[in-house]
Regions:
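Walker A (P-loop) phosphate-binding loop of P-loop NTPases
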Residues: 30
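Hydrophobic positions on the alpha1 helix immediately C-terminal to the Walker A/P-loop
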Residues: 36
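Hydrophobic anchor at the beta1->P-loop junction of P-loop NTPases
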Residues: 25
Length: 228
């Protein structure tokens, strides 16, 4: 296992906006992130929170253009280029949207993918190394991380079955081979070990209602514990 600088890990902290929260969802294809994000959004709005749902890459005009260019490309992108493209989109999302919106009290931002996807995709699956990814992000605003990350974990077999059931066209990353997707799981598992206080691992193979209740409990623990 790659040795990660512990002092570097300590540089990654959530933004400080009393009464507002930044939450991310992670997982491989077929984990059901989108379904759970939508349900959690409805739940939080019922609790009178102002909820914004963002995605990575994306969330800004610049980020959405990068997303389209990356996911629709028919040529291989160099791993270093991938890494910096995602970091670029993330920096813009943070400055243009996240930090401004969190300044409004009672706001919750939910982001579909964030830093841990870069750790999994470029750090592990593309073999750039996690240390390099973290060093790239050790600068404002990229060192800012969510208050809580929900990692909806499924195995490769479950992912492939669910993708087959959806029968959707595959994008740049979805079309990679099985070994790539197994490395993604390894990458997310490693991220969970590196940031255990931030990342909550939820078993995504269960019934969607059971998964939802587990996630809701994690969200409640974050929000209402912090309010106390």
């Amino acid at each position: 296992m790659e040795e990660i600088n512990k002092e570097l890990l300590q540089q990654f902290r959530p933004p400080a906006f009393p009464g507002s929260f930044f939450i991310s969802f992670e997982g491989i294809e077929g984990a059901g992130k989108t379904t759970q994000i939508n349900r959690i959004k409805d739940y939080l709005e019922d609790k009178d929170f102002r909820v914004l749902v963002l995605r990575e890459p994306g969330g800004t005009p610049y980020g959405e253009k990068l997303r389209k260019a990356i996911l629709e490309t028919s040529t291989n992108i160099h791993p270093v280029a991938e890494s910096y493209l995602f970091a670029s989109a993330r920096a813009q999302l943070l400055t243009e949207v996240v930090l401004k919106e969190l300044n409004t009290p009672n706001t919750i931002i939910i982001c579909d993918r964030y830093l841990d996807s870069t750790i999994a995709y470029q750090g592990i699956a593309r073999e750039l190394g996690v240390q390099r990814i973290l060093e790239t992000h050790n600068v404002f605003p990229l060192h800012l991380v969510p208050h809580r990350t929900i990692y909806v974990k499924i195995d490769l077999e479950t992912s492939l079955k669910r993708q087959e059931m959806r029968n959707n066209p595959k994008d740049y990353f979805e079309s990679q081979d099985h070994s790539f997707h197994q490395k993604l799981i390894d990458g997310y598992d490693l991220a969970s070990e590196l940031f255990p206080e931030r990342i909550s691992v939820v078993d995504g193979k269960r019934d969607f209602d059971e998964v939802y209740l587990s996630i809701r409990q994690q969200i409640d623990d974050l929000i209402f514990k912090k309010e106390d």
